[in-house]
Amino acid sequence: MPAIAILTGASSGIGAAAAQQFMDRGDTVINISRRDCPVAGVETIGTDLGDAKSLASTCAALSERLGSQPDGPVCLVHNASLMLKDRCDVTSDEDLERVLAVNVVG
């Protein structure tokens, strides 16, 4: 039975490769990201994973898209992440909070 795969950060790299694998299996793939996924057939819900209001809007869009009883199993792959280029001792609190918001909270 085809699954519904929800991936964060499928706009490039490992996330896009994972999206391609799910698509190759015949699954429905939804990308949660600020940018579109380059894989044909992947639906994108534009989201800033570090922003609470954006996440709330995304949850509403997913609920509307999937309904109360999705057809098939649902898989969530939280792949999105941010990486700082500066050393920890020169990283601002705001930058660290942004990384935690995307990598952990989002």
Feature annotation, model-predicted:
Residues 50-67:
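Conserved Rossmann-fold cofactor-binding substructure of NAD(P)-dependent oxidoreductases
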